[in-house]
């Protein structure tokens, strides 16, 4: 049973992103009003805004939390072509904010010449690293060599994706069998049939990221992308938000089937595809065990998807924009989890509404 709580966010323009911290008791929001707000959950379950500040000189597209092992750290990215790292500190004894916490900017990352469309911290086992992607088609990976000094970040990698980038996701697996991996989505809407999702893998020999795979079946603009938490699986699960919701499995091929010294090759299958939103899908997000996927779309609803014991994915819940659930199995629909020879039949046209995006 879901309990919905409405929050008067007091942003003065569109809210583009909402991000929860590791424990789910803190929340950050960002908006076209150029600000970020931090919210804390009280013991009664109410959310209270505990900080609000102007972060950029343009619309703020994304905000994300670092793992709490590195402190209370946020990163944001903006249309102003920058990403920024923020840290919450407690006022010193000689500070007028003595004993009070407040957020300070630790660094501004200025390497992009175009809108920075997404920013994500790497899994904590990799240290304090973050990746950004930009409308110029470049993914950049930064590292803070000293976690006690967040003003120093070094640009470690620049990866060209050939298409404007809209979203990125780190593979969260900490297994030594899985090298660091980043999935990149593009919302390029030019009339071509180029694939919009690319997978890049870190190569220990060359110490560079190289393209491992391309999801050739995703040719529509991609708005969000998310690897599922791994929890010991030998394969990866990737969710893609485009004109519908798609879930892929990526199973690494045996080493003898891949080129020596080259990136891992994968056997890629689409295991679910849902057009229930009947509109553009803007966000996908996994629960902590990687067993439930939430998606939100222009229909104003959040839908929850879960696989059964046969690995067939079905819609298990729908929440309207006002937080009220949609009752009745007819509303849930048969979400077509079984995809095989009938995949082409699912490419039905969707009458989704267009929305202003980052490159306009």
Curated annotation (Swiss-Prot):
In the UniProt record, the gene name given for this protein reads Seh1l
Per the record, residues carrying Phosphoserine are 190
Q: Where is this chain compositionally biased, Low complexity type?
A: 327-351
Gene Ontology CC: one annotated term: nuclear pore
Q: What is this protein called?
A: Nucleoporin SEH1
Q: Which family does it belong to?
A: Belongs to the WD repeat SEC13 family.
Q: Where is this cross-link: Glycyl lysine isopeptide (Lys-Gly) (interchain with G-Cter in SUMO2)?
A: 12
State the organism named in the record.
Mus musculus (Mouse)
Per UniProt, activity regulation is: The GATOR2 complex is negatively regulated by the upstream amino acid sensors CASTOR1 and SESN2, which sequester the GATOR2 complex in absence of amino acids. In the presence of abundant amino acids, GATOR2 is released from CASTOR1 and SESN2 and activated.
Q: Subunit details for this protein?
A: Component of the Nup107-160 subcomplex of the nuclear pore complex (NPC). The Nup107-160 subcomplex includes NUP160, NUP133, NUP107, NUP98, NUP85, NUP43, NUP37, SEH1 and SEC13. The SEH1 subunit appears to be only weakly associated with the Nup107-160 subcomplex. Component of the GATOR2 subcomplex, composed of MIOS, SEC13, SEH1L, WDR24 and WDR59. The GATOR2 complex interacts with CASTOR1 and CASTOR2; the interaction is negatively regulated by arginine. The GATOR2 complex interacts with SESN1, SESN2 and SESN3; the interaction is negatively regulated by amino acids.
Provide this UniProt record's keywords sorted from A to Z. Cell cycle, Cell division, Centromere, Chromosome, Chromosome partition, Isopeptide bond, Kinetochore, Lysosome, Membrane, Mitosis, mRNA transport, Nuclear pore complex, Nucleus, Phosphoprotein, Protein transport, Repeat, Translocation, Transport, Ubl conjugation, WD repeat
Query: What is the role of the protein in this entry?
Result: Component of the Nup107-160 subcomplex of the nuclear pore complex (NPC). The Nup107-160 subcomplex is required for the assembly of a functional NPC. The Nup107-160 subcomplex is also required for normal kinetochore microtubule attachment, mitotic progression and chromosome segregation. This subunit plays a role in recruitment of the Nup107-160 subcomplex to the kinetochore.
The listed locations are:
Chromosome, Centromere, Kinetochore; Nucleus, Nuclear pore complex; Lysosome membrane
Q: Which residues cross the membrane?
A: none
Using the UniProt record, give the first listed, main subcellular location: nucleus
* WD repeat residue intervals: 10-49, 55-96, 111-152, 160-210, 217-258, 276-315
Q: Which GO terms describe its molecular function?
A: structural molecule activity
Would the keyword Ubl conjugation turn up in this protein's UniProt record? Answer: yes
